[in-house]
């Protein structure tokens, strides 16, 4: 009975709706030493629940046939089923789930003993990670079970997934809020205790701390409340302090016990803060230039008359002398010329803040028109579709 306290169905209706939308639904239930059977047709019971034998098994077998009267297509997607069953196996360590597709003689077994640790490992496959996976499970005094696994990698995207009673919340909620608060506090305390912020002379934000982070948050809540019937956001107020308290305790201990991992994570955060600050300065630089120059374009750029990017070409030439020759020989209607100093900067090896401080790189950014930074970069604003 305890397992049902933290179970969740499809929008709270589950098998009731499956039954109503099926031309046939057949139940076999093994319980308390007996096997029971019942069958429905288009939602109507064909006979009362009956005992058909004795058993030492425990469990339920449900078979259903979708109604062609309701659905124009009744073909099941094995890819969708596989994705959800894999997710459920990660969320319930040690539970063995078998997916069979008898149409093509396909079978796959999902059985992940590592639970959320293996979930994070699966998501981060092929990426360079900065720390070993941090993973904890705890039962709080409020009766809420909290499980978290996380790892940083060298990418720039945050990938945090939230679940309540095995149900995903794509819009997060109170469990995500508690996690973020504890994560930011723990990292800030570490950075301050190691005097890193003063040494590096930077201010970090929560976004900086979560750059490159992959995390799974799973809570088991006896009576969860959601913002809508689709359960895409958890709003139970008691979950935030439960997650925050558990995460704060476990994560602070992890940073103290794993100094090398903590140092790598701190380095990633500092780089993210510098990049964010450099992007802000670049945006300000571009805006100042736009205010001074009506066209908002670099002074050395000889622009073309064509306004359609698909028909416009930009030629990058080395130095002012080459720029002069190129301007004389170009087709003014569709060809723009931008002179640049030779070998401006190897941006592959340069840190973002150094790259953005280069005048030539700034000129390129302004000329291309795409903007810079996570909030403002838009490749659709590219002013030339052919760059030579």
Curated annotation (Swiss-Prot):
Catalysed conversion reaction: ATP-dependent breakage, passage and rejoining of double-stranded DNA
GO cellular component terms given for this protein: cytoplasm
GO molecular-function terms, A-Z: ATP binding; DNA binding; DNA topoisomerase type II (double strand cut, ATP-hydrolyzing) activity
EC supergroup of this enzyme: isomerase
Gene3D superfamilies named among the record's database cross-references: 3.30.230.10, 3.40.50.670, Histidine kinase-like ATPase, C-terminal domain (3.30.565.10)
A Gene Ontology BP annotation from the UniProt entry: DNA topological change
Family to which the UniProt record says this protein belongs: Belongs to the type II topoisomerase GyrB family.
The protein's name: DNA gyrase subunit B
Organism: Acinetobacter genomosp. 6
């Amino acid at each position: 009975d305890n397992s049902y306290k933290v179970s969740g169905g499809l929008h709270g209706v589950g098998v009731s709706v499956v039954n109503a939308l099926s031309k046939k639904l057949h139940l076999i239930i093994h319980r308390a030493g007996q096997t029971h059977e019942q069958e429905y047709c288009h939602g109507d019971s064909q006979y009362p629940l009956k005992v058909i034998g004795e058993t030492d098994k425990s469990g339920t077998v449900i078979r259903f046939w979708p109604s062609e009267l309701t659905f124009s297509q009744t073909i099941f997607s094995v890819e969708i089923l596989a994705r959800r069953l894999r997710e459920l196996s990660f969320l319930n360590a040690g539970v063995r789930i078998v997916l069979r597709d008898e149409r093509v003689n396909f079978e796959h077994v999902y059985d992940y003993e590592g639970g959320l640790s293996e979930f994070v490992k699966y998501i981060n496959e092929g990426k360079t990670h900065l720390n070993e996976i941090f993973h904890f499970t705890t039962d709080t005094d409020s009766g809420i079970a909290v499980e978290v696994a996380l790892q940083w990698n060298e990418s720039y995207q945050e990938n945090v997934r939230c679940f309540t009673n095995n149900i995903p919340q794509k819009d997060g909620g109170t469990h995500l809020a508690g996690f973020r608060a504890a994560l930011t506090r723990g990292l800030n305390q570490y950075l301050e205790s190691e005097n890193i912020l003063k040494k590096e002379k930077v201010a970090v934000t929560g976004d900086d701390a979560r750059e490159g982070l992959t995390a799974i948050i799973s809570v088991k809540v006896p009576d969860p409340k959601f913002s809508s019937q689709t359960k895409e956001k958890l709003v139970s107020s008691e979950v935030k302090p439960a997650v925050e308290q558990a995460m704060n305790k476990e994560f602070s201990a992890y940073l103290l016990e794993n100094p090398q991992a903590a140092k790598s994570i701190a380095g990633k955060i500092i780089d993210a803060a510098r990049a964010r600050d450099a992007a802000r300065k670049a945006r300000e630089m571009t805006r100042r230039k736009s205010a001074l120059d009506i066209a908002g374009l670099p002074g050395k750029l000889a622009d073309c008359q064509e306004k359609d990017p698909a028909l416009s070409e930009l030629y990058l030439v080395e130095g002012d002398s080459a720029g002069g020759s190129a301007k004389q020989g170009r087709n003014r209607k569709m060809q723009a010329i931008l002179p640049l100093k030779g070998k401006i900067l190897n941006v592959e090896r340069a840190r973002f803040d150094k790259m953005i401080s280069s005048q030539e790189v700034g000129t390129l950014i302004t000329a291309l028109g795409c903007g810079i930074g996570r909030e403002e970069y838009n490749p659709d604003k590219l002013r030339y579709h052919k760059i030579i």
